[in-house]
Amino acid sequence: MNSENFRLSEKLVSASYVRQGLDARRGHEQLIRRLLDQGKCPEEGWSESTIELFLNELAVMDSNNFLGNCGVGEREGRVASSLVARRHYRLIHGIGRSGDIAAVQPKAAGSSLLNKITNSVVLDVLKLTGVRSVSSCFVVPMATGMSLTLCFLTLRHRRPKARYILWPRIDQKSCFKSMVTAGFEPVVIENVLEGDELRTNLEEVERKIEEFGAENTLCVHSTTSCFAPRVPDRLEELSVLCAKHDIPHIVNNAYGVQPSKCMHLIQQGARVGRIDAFVQSLDKNFVVPVGGAIIAGFDENFIQEISKIYPGRASASPSLDVLITLLTLGANGYKKLLADRKELYGHLAQELSALAARHGERLLKTPHNPISLAMSLNHLEAHSSSAVTQLGSMLFTRQVSGARVVPLGVQQTVSGHTFSGFMSHSEAYPCPYLNAASAIGITKGDVTVCMKRLGKCLKILKKEKSDPADLEAEDGELEESPQRSTELRV
C-alpha cells in the first residue's frame, strides 16, 4: 500500500479510518527508514509485524518474486516446497556472487540489501559490546572453525612462505583442525599454571618466533572464550609481540561477544599492538541456530580480502536469522540478555562453590574467565577411579546438558597430533574437575535444577559397595525441569 492506494481506498471506506491506517503504516515505515538510513541496531525491538513487513518488502525486490519474471538460467530461485519458501521469506537467491560473498546480485536486490544491512547492524552491535574501533565485519554461513580457516587461507596469499601457526593450547578440536585444514602446521604452545588458572606462555611464544623465523610464521592464533581453568589469552601482550615481529594475529572469539571482558581484551589488543581479525559464532552469542559466524577486524581492506576468498554464493539463512533476532531484541533487549548472563554467572559461582564445599571439593579460582567455572573432583576420584567419568554420563542421562567432566590423563589424537591431558588444556593439570558455564540465555531455574541433580549424582557416586541397579533405584525421579520456553523473553 502506497499513498495513492490509500487515497483510492477512501472511495470504499471512511476517509478518517483510512487515514488512521495510513498513520499506522507510516509508523512501520519510519522504523524501516531509520534502519536503512543509519544501519544501526534499533534501541528498542521491533514487533513481528514490522519485521515481516520489512522482509516481505525485500523479497519482492528479488527476481524470483517478480510477477512477470521468466527465468531461463540454471539458478532462478526456484523452490519446490512452499513450506521451504515461507521458511526463508521467499529470499531464495542467497548472498554474494561467485567472486565475492559481499557482492551485490543483479537478480536479487532484496537479498543483497539484506546482506548489507545485516553486516551493518552486526558491526554496530560489536561496537556497543566493547570493540569500538572495529571498522568492518561480515556474516559468513560457516561456524567458527571454518571461518578461521578462511582467515588463514587469506593470509596465505599475503605470506606465501609461511608454514607455521603459533597456537596457545586450547583443547577444542575445531580450532586445531581449522589450521590443519588450511594446510598449515600448528605449533602448540603449552599454557603455564598460575594458581588454578592456565595462562598464556608469552616467553615460549617469543622463543618459537625466533626458532621458526617471523617470515615462516603465518600468524599467532589466540583465544578469548574458553573452558575454565584455562582463561583468555594475554591478548595485549600477544598483540604487542605480533606488531614487534610483523606477524598477523587472528583471534578465536567464539563466544566472547557475551562478556565485556573478552571484547575489552580485543579492543585493547588492537590499540596497543596488532589484531588482524577476530571471529565469533552467531549461535553462541546471538541465540540463533548453528551455522554462522562473524569475521571482523580493524583493517577494512583485509576483511574485504577474506570475503573475496570465499568461493561462490552463500546461504542467507544465518544473516536472516541474526537480523530478525537483533531487530526483535533491539540494542536494549540484547544488552539486557548480556546483563542477565553476567548476573547469573555470579549466582552460578556461588551455588557451585557451596555445593563443592558440601562434598569436600572446591571451586577453582579462575577470576580471568568471565563465562566458565570449574569445580575440583579430587575427593570423588580418590573414592573411585571410575567415578569421575561416570559422573559425566550420569549428568547427561539426567538431562543436564553442557556440564563437562574432565578426568586426568586422557590422550587424544587430533589431525595427527597427540594431546596429553586432553580436555584440560594442559599436559599435567593437578586435578580432575567439572565445568559449568553461564552463557547467554541461561536462567536461574537452569542453575537451581543443575545443582540439585549434580548434588544427587555426587551423593550416589560416593555410596560404597553399591551396584549400578541400586544407584539407579536410589536416584529416583528427575526433579521438575525449569519451566521455560525455547524463546527468550526480554
Curated annotation (Swiss-Prot):
Region entry Phosphate loop (P-loop), spans: 96-106
GO cellular component: cytoplasm
Cofactors named for this entry: pyridoxal 5'-phosphate
Binding sites annotated in the UniProt record for pyridoxal 5'-phosphate: 75
A GO BP annotation: selenocysteine incorporation
Reaction equation(s) it catalyzes: O-phospho-L-seryl-tRNA(Sec) + selenophosphate + H2O = L-selenocysteinyl-tRNA(Sec) + 2 phosphate
Function, in words: Converts O-phosphoseryl-tRNA(Sec) to selenocysteinyl-tRNA(Sec) required for selenoprotein biosynthesis.
Keywords on record: Cytoplasm, Protein biosynthesis, Pyridoxal phosphate, RNA-binding, Selenium, Transferase, tRNA-binding
Segments of skewed composition (Acidic residues): 469-480
Location(s), subcellular: Cytoplasm
Stated name of the protein: O-phosphoseryl-tRNA(Sec) selenium transferase
Keyword Transport listed: no
Gene: sepsecs
Quaternary data: Homotetramer formed by a catalytic dimer and a non-catalytic dimer serving as a binding platform that orients tRNASec for catalysis. Each tetramer binds the CCA ends of two tRNAs which point to the active sites of the catalytic dimer.
GO molecular function terms listed in the Swiss-Prot or TrEMBL record: O-phosphoseryl-tRNA(Sec) selenium transferase activity; tRNA binding
Binding site for substrate: 97-98, 105, 313
Region (Tetramerization): 1-44
Site keyed May act as a substrate filter by repelling compounds with a negatively charged alpha-carboxylate: positions: 74
Region feature Disordered, mapped onto this chain: 466-490
